[in-house]
């Protein structure tokens, strides 16, 4: 079996911790120094995807033509505009 070669990318993004055990053996542990940042980035992307799904859902709902939904449609549109402004500011 071949071992993976370290590329400049893996060398720069992974941090190697070498520890000594009680019996003198050395152990290597790979850690990502920016793992918290990476998780945060993934969560942001996932929330954007969720927001996009909400937008698609509301657009589909608002496209339904029904006289009883006329007033609801304007209220939802106003609320949605306020909500989306706040989301982008945050």
Curated annotation (Swiss-Prot):
Keywords attached to this entry: Apoptosis, Host cytoplasm, Host membrane, Host mitochondrion, Host mitochondrion inner membrane, Host nucleus, Host-virus interaction, Inhibition of host innate immune response by virus, Inhibition of host MAVS by virus, Inhibition of host RLR pathway by virus, Membrane, Modulation of host cell apoptosis by virus, Viral immunoevasion
Miscellaneous section: Is not encoded in all strains, and seems to be dispensable for replication.
Q: Between which residues do disulfide bridges form?
A: none
What job does the chain carry out?
A: Plays an important role in promoting lung pathology in both primary viral infection and secondary bacterial infection. Promotes alteration of mitochondrial morphology, dissipation of mitochondrial membrane potential, and cell death. Alternatively, inhibits the production of interferon in the infected cell at the level of host mitochondrial antiviral signaling MAVS. Its level of expression differs greatly depending on which cell type is infected, in a manner that is independent of the levels of expression of other viral proteins. Monocytic cells are more affected than epithelial cells.
- Region: Mitochondrial targeting sequence; residue ranges are 65-87
Organism domain of life: Viruses
The similarity comment for this entry is:
Belongs to the influenza viruses PB1-F2 family.
What this protein is called in its record is Protein PB1-F2
Under Pfam families, the record lists: PB1-F2
Q: Where in the cell is it found?
A: Host mitochondrion inner membrane; Host nucleus; Host cytoplasm, Host cytosol
Question: Composition bias, kind Polar residues: at what positions?
Answer: 1-27
Q: Return the GO cellular component terms, semicolon-separated.
A: host cell cytosol; host cell mitochondrial inner membrane; host cell nucleus; membrane
Q: Name one GO biological process term.
A: symbiont-mediated suppression of host cytoplasmic pattern recognition receptor signaling pathway via inhibition of MAVS activity
Q: Where is this region: Disordered?
A: 1-31
How does it associate, per the subunit comment?
A: Oligomer. Interacts with human SLC25A6/ANT3 and VDAC1. Interacts with host MAVS.
InterPro entries assigned: Flu_proapoptotic_PB1-F2
Q: Where is this site: High pathogenicity?
A: 66
């Amino acid at each position: 079996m071949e071992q993976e070669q370290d590329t400049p990318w893996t060398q720069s993004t992974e941090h190697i911790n070498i520890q000594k055990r009680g019996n003198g053996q050395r152990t290597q542990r790979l850690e990502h120094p920016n793992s918290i940042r990476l998780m945060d980035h993934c969560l942001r992307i996932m929330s954007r995807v969720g927001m996009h799904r909400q937008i698609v859902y509301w657009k589909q709902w608002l496209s339904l033509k029904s006289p009883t939904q006329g007033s609801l449609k304007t209220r939802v549109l106003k609320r949605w505009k306020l909500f989306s402004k706040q989301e982008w500011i945050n």
